[in-house]
Amino acid sequence: MNPPESSPLGKASACVDQYDATLLFPIARADQRAELGISGAAPFFGADLWTAFELSWLNQRGKPQVALAHITVPCETPRIVESKSFKLYLNSFSNTRFADAAQVQARIRADVSAAVWRGAASAGSVGVTLLGPDRFAQELMQELDGLSLDRLDVQCTQYQPAPELLSAQHDAAPVSERLTSQLLKSNCPVTGQPDWASVQIAYRGPPIDQEGLLQYLVSFRNHSGFHEQCVERIFMDLWTRCQPIELTVYARYTRRGGLDINPLRTSHPQGLPRNMRTARQ
């Protein structure tokens, strides 16, 4: 068992510049999900989309190479990797020689897969894509699509998750809506540092009260939780209180330490969106 308090997060850490897979610090999802009343298989699908902006290694002649990395971690994995440990792990590539980018990509895939699937009855694999400088121009920027809840002039008084703010018109005809907000903010449960995010909520079902939904999202402002847990809490609260037929919650968190984490949870299996950053990322 690796409690978050034992991770390198919030502590002084030596900068290791020789490849070291043991720097990865897995944290069990089950502990966080138990707080949401989830035991056993989770009632959703999805993944955590990571972007690593600070990845470098040496080629066989000692010349530095750089790349962006997109990592896709299925939400079915029993563990996540604590973000600072992942940064330290990537830093450990910086003075290590590799034959080519494909070898680096394969090493990251193998190491992260082993960390997040640790303890599973059957292990799977994470997705890893490296983009070299010749492809940097293909990395576009796009905001989350949907009707902005932030247009609403609501009074906000609660800054801890308040699911009682959520409601839906269960006697009305089902609708399909895609709603967004730039106002999601929570705090790291270990360091207390702020985590800022844009969030998109797509659903089909009874019309959700938009003012209450915005107030609910704002209520995370002083909440302590990892990115993945916050998105799962939002999903579970909406699923329980508003009872949509279909639901997808997708948040894109601003970058910290050269990494951004973008969890998506959905009630029905679907293709993942392109990992495309927003302006604040």
From Swiss-Prot:
Stated family = Belongs to the GTP cyclohydrolase I family. QueF type 2 subfamily.
Ordered alphabetically, the record's keywords are: Cytoplasm, NADP, Oxidoreductase, Queuosine biosynthesis
Among Pfam families, the record links this protein to: QueF, QueF_N
> Annotated region Disordered: where?
261-281
Spell out the subunit comment.
Answer: Homodimer.
Broad EC category: oxidoreductase
Q: Which residues bind substrate?
A: 81-83, 227-228
What does the UniProt record say this protein does? Catalyzes the NADPH-dependent reduction of 7-cyano-7-deazaguanine (preQ0) to 7-aminomethyl-7-deazaguanine (preQ1).
Q: Which SUPFAM superfamilies match?
A: Tetrahydrobiopterin biosynthesis enzymes-like (SSF55620)
**HAMAP family from the UniProt entry:** QueF_type2
Residues given in the record as NADPH binding sites: 83-84, 256-257
What NCBIfam families has UniProt attached to this entry? QueF (TIGR03138)
Listed under catalytic activity are: 7-aminomethyl-7-carbaguanine + 2 NADP(+) = 7-cyano-7-deazaguanine + 2 NADPH + 3 H(+)
Question: What pathway does the annotation place this protein in?
Answer: tRNA modification; tRNA-queuosine biosynthesis
Enzyme Commission numbers on file: 1.7.1.13
Which residues are the active-site ones? 188 (thioimide intermediate), 195 (proton donor)
PANTHER family documented for this protein: NADPH-DEPENDENT 7-CYANO-7-DEAZAGUANINE REDUCTASE
What molecular functions are annotated in GO for this chain?
preQ1 synthase activity
Gene3D superfamilies tied to this protein: 3.30.1130.10
Which protein, by its recorded name, is this? NADPH-dependent 7-cyano-7-deazaguanine reductase
Q: Enumerate the Gene Ontology biological process terms.
A: queuosine biosynthetic process; tRNA modification
GO cellular component terms, semicolon-separated: cytoplasm
Q: Where in the cell is it found?
A: Cytoplasm
